Curated annotation (Swiss-Prot):
The gene is mug. Transmembrane segments: none annotated. GO terms for molecular function: DNA binding; pyrimidine-specific mismatch base pair DNA N-glycosylase activity; uracil DNA N-glycosylase activity. It comes from Escherichia coli O9:H4 (strain HS). It comes from the Bacteria. This is G/U mismatch-specific DNA glycosylase. GO terms for biological process: base-excision repair, AP site formation. It holds the Pfam family UDG.
Amino acid sequence: MVEDILAPGLRVVFCGINPGLSSAGTGFPFAHPANRFWKVIYQAGFTDRQLKPQEAQHLLDYRCGVTKLVDRPTVQASEVSKQELHAGGRKLIEKIEDYQPQALAILGKQAYEQGFSQRGAQWGKQTLTIGSTQIWVLPNPSGLSRVSLEKLVEAYRELDQALVVRGR
């Protein structure tokens, strides 16, 4: 089981779709060696060094957290049903209402659209909010994603810089 890493007062909570088998086996988020999450958040400026999956709790030192839409691990996120994503979106709203981070970053357009019953999402900041929490849709850093490392870092850096501008 991959536990959430959440606390009050966070700048951002990154929300993956669901744990892969590597994460489920180790208990650490974004644990597959091909997953670029840790590299991307470092290069985008969220952390001052590249953390390892087993150091995930240290995200809190940087006022960052992680969660997921669906708890069930799969080989590929495409194995998660629309119903699971929709139910996960409802649970996620409750979590975010409790913790009220500055931003929630959903990692994937389809995950956002199905989890929040939205259509035609674009990358970046969304008009939908959860209380005072901004919702952002960022490309998924999975090794299965075709998005280049450069584009991932650019998208995540936009969020980091927006939070800096807000004084967070």
